Amino acid sequence: MELSPNNQIEDRKPILTADGLVQTSNSPFEPTISQETQTSNGIGTQCQLTVDQLDIEILPIIYDVVRCVEKDPLENAVKLRESQDCNHKIFELQKRFESAREQIRQLPGIDYNKDEQLQRLELLRNQFKLKQQLIRKYKDTEF
């Protein structure tokens, strides 16, 4: 643990780079402690979600909206009530879309563009290969 220039504690973990060197500073792909501190202090109130934790259930509401639009009542009073119900269901669908957008914004890595994600993936693959090689090397060594 080290102190940053603004006197916040930063946890700098050693990282094995693709060329086999150990890097102690945070990479541009990992959040710094100050970003995590902002989140824990309530400045950024988002928490990290996984794809499995997403609660995006929009198909039943879309089905209800389509059913509502397909109805064609003959009486004006019934038409008005059906129209209000349809507007309510559309508003509910809009709320679900907004909720889905908020949840997707909380996914880790969503703020990286495609090139950054591919670069990060390649780096992780190289780290994985290096770790596999180290494991094989130490398995073969006798103590």
Curated annotation (Swiss-Prot):
Q: Name one GO biological process term.
A: regulation of transcription by RNA polymerase II
What does the record give under GO molecular function?
Answer: transcription coregulator activity
Q: ATP-binding: is it a keyword of this entry?
A: no
* Domain of life where this protein originates: Eukaryota
Looking up Pfam families in the UniProt record yields:
Med9
Q: Which UniProt keywords apply?
A: Activator, Coiled coil, Nucleus, Transcription, Transcription regulation
Q: What is its main location?
A: nucleus
The coiled-coil segments of this chain are 84-141
Q: Name one GO cellular component term.
A: mediator complex
Q: Does the keyword Transcription regulation apply?
A: yes
Where in the cell is the protein located? Nucleus
Entry similarity comment: Belongs to the Mediator complex subunit 9 family.
Q: What does this protein do?
A: Component of the Mediator complex, a coactivator involved in the regulated transcription of nearly all RNA polymerase II-dependent genes. Mediator functions as a bridge to convey information from gene-specific regulatory proteins to the basal RNA polymerase II transcription machinery. Mediator is recruited to promoters by direct interactions with regulatory proteins and serves as a scaffold for the assembly of a functional preinitiation complex with RNA polymerase II and the general transcription factors.
Which PANTHER family does the record match to this protein? MEDIATOR OF RNA POLYMERASE II TRANSCRIPTION SUBUNIT 9 (PTHR20844:SF0), MEDIATOR OF RNA POLYMERASE II TRANSCRIPTION, SUBUNIT 9 (PTHR20844)
Q: How does it assemble?
A: Component of the Mediator complex.
Output this protein's name: Mediator of RNA polymerase II transcription subunit 9
Question: Which gene name belongs to this protein?
Answer: MED9
